[in-house]
A protein has these predicted regions:
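Active-site rim/adjacent substrate-binding subdomains
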Residues: 1-140, 145-186
Length: 186
């Protein structure tokens, strides 16, 4: 089922998400709904807070990029109770990012090129590994949502000032996008 995306200004986007118990009800259905919502919204990743749930569940679907990046063919994974344990800040990269919760807004964000991540997959198998490249960027972006952050929090004060009017418009529910949203109440 395709769910609405909660947009900037929704309180759930500012909460630190909680780990879920291993017997979380309907977890597989939730993950499937998140993949369907992400696909319908043309995203590459989605965190549970973006659908109104303050829990540590993220999905990443890089298969949509496989024409350009063959290494991401069939890359569709869930990250349950995920945590970034280490950032290798020896190399960073600045790249334009957008977010389904901030439709129409794109800004350059600097992130570590390599991170060490721990998570459970959709079968509740534990993983711990170094991740790099674009996948590391997507995981950092989505895991920020689990910490109550959005990508605009990583901008310089000058850039934040430059986009103030766009953020205010989002807060007022002035949103143009092709997917269903749950905007903040005016």
């Amino acid at each position: 089922m395709v769910l609405p995306i909660y947009t900037y200004g929704q309180p759930v986007l500012r909460k630190v998400a909680k780990d879920i118990p291993l017997d979380y009800p309907d977890l597989k259905e939730l993950i499937q709904d998140m993949f369907e919502t992400n696909t319908a919204s043309d995203g590459v990743g989605l965190a549970a807070p973006q659908i109104g749930k303050s829990i540590r569940v993220v999905i990443v679907d890089l298969d949509v990029l496989s024409d350009t990046f063959p290494e991401y063919k069939d890359y569709r994974h869930a990250f349950i109770n995920g945590h970034i344990l280490e950032y290798d800040d020896s190399e960073t990269e600045t790249m334009e990012e957008g977010c389904l919760s901030l439709p129409g807004l794109h800004e350059n964000v600097t992130r570590a090129k390599r991170i060490y991540v721990k998570w459970l997959d959709e079968n509740l198998v534990e993983h711990e590994e170094w991740v790099d490249g674009y996948l590391a960027r997507v995981i950092q972006h989505e895991f920020d949502h689990l910490e109550g952050r959005v990508f605009t929090d990583r901008l310089t004060p000058f850039r934040k000032q430059m986009i103030t009017s766009k953020l205010k418009a989002l807060l007022q529910g002035k949103i143009r996008c092709h997917y269903r949203v749950e905007a903040p109440r005016k």
